[in-house]
């Protein structure tokens, strides 16, 4: 999606893709110019790990997270966009919940509810559970595991522009099975990213969205991806997965590991490190992130830290 054009919407979610049909060579699309041209300033909402396993979890997401995001969008004077950072659903070793959960989560995240175009990104728990041993794993298994997600939400690797920013979303999970998944990128993904970034001016900021934190890992093709990002003036990596908050810097990259919207898997209202359930809001100005805040669900944006006396009983 070019920076100076609206995000096309369908069924309440961004719709920038079409399913390919064998034998069809032409795919048409329409772009609508933004009234004021490309936006020099905007807010980007990053929502990690809704991780809803059942209707009880979805009800909490609908009643807590969704209206909280909508209220922040309504209070903003800037254009607002959003992206999830994976684990929208929650598969388990023996049961695949994603067929039931995905359609309900798609409804929960529509623009008329959250107030902004909310792009989607795949996490390890969004893969379809396929019975295959790690030794028998092939690229075909990894691709097959992402088909349920693609059917509901669209591609797992894509990019779009807003303002002077190039935003990339990628599936960084190698998925032989529910237990054996690992951080990494297939060779074809690295080549796709290389081609994608070849069209992006080096003075643009790149926001690179994945599920599993990168942390300068030596896992499959991670270093190759980081090398592709290195030439850009400012790079922010947005990730989730951990259910705790963390910040990492390496090379010219700043990685934001986000606390989960579901906290500790909807068992309470906090993550495993005590961070409240929530999401992040980034204020983008030109080709830099001017400011950001972790927005705790149900609290004012100024609510950022709380200390307890260690000798007290709670």
Tell what function each PLM region has.
Residues 9-20, 26, 48-51, 66-71, ...:
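Metal-dependent phosphoesterase/phosphodiesterase active-site architecture
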Residues 42, 80, 157, 164-165, ...:
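Alpha/beta-hydrolase fold active-site loops
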Residues 6, 11-14, 20-96:
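N-terminal active-site segment of His-dependent metallophosphoesterases
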Residues 93-194, 198-200, 223-238, 247-284:
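Extended active-site neighborhood of metal-dependent phosphoesterases/phosphodiesterases
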Residues 197-217:
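Short acidic, glycine-rich surface-loop motifs adjacent to enzyme active sites
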Residues 49, 86-87, 123-124, 211, ...:
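Active-site glycine-centered loops adjacent to acidic/histidine catalytic or metal-binding residues
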Residues 44-46, 82-84, 120, 208, ...:
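Residue-level marker for buried hydrophobic side chains located in beta-strands
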């Amino acid at each position: 999606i070019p920076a100076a054009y609206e995000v096309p919407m369908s069924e309440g979610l961004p719709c920038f893709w079409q399913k390919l049909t064998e034998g069809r060579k032409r795919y048409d699309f329409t772009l609508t110019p933004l009234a004021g041209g490309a936006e020099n300033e905007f807010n980007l909402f990053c929502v990690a790990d809704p991780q809803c396993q059942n209707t009880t979890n979805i009800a909490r997401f609908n009643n807590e997270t969704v209206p909280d995001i909508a209220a922040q969008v309504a209070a903003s004077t800037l254009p607002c966009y959003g992206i999830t950072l994976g684990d929208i659903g929650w598969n388990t070793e023996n049961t695949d919940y994603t067929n039931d959960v995905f359609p309900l989560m798609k409804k929960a995240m529509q623009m008329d509810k959250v107030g902004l175009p909310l792009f989607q990104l795949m996490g390890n728990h969004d893969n379809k559970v396929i019975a295959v041993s790690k030794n028998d794993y092939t690229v075909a298994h990894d691709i097959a595991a992402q088909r349920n997600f693609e059917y509901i939400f669209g591609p797992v690797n894509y990019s779009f522009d807003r303002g002077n920013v190039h935003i990339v979303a990628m599936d960084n999970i190698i998925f032989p099975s529910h237990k054996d998944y690992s951080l990494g990128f297939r060779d074809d993904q690295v080549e796709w990213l290389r081609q994608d970034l070849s069209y992006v001016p080096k003075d643009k900021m790149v926001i690179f969205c994945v599920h599993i934190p990168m942390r300068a890992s030596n896992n499959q093709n991670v270093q190759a991806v980081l090398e592709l990002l290195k030439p850009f003036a400012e790079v922010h990596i947005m990730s989730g997965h951990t259910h705790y908050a963390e910040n990492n810097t390496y090379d010219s990259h700043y990685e934001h590991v986000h606390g989960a919207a579901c906290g500790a898997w909807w068992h309470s209202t906090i993550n495993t490190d005590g961070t409240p359930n929530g999401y992040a809001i980034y204020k983008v100005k030109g080709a830099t992130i001017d400011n950001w805040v972790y927005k705790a669900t149900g609290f004012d944006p100024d609510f950022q830290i709380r200390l307890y006396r260690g000798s007290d009983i709670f």
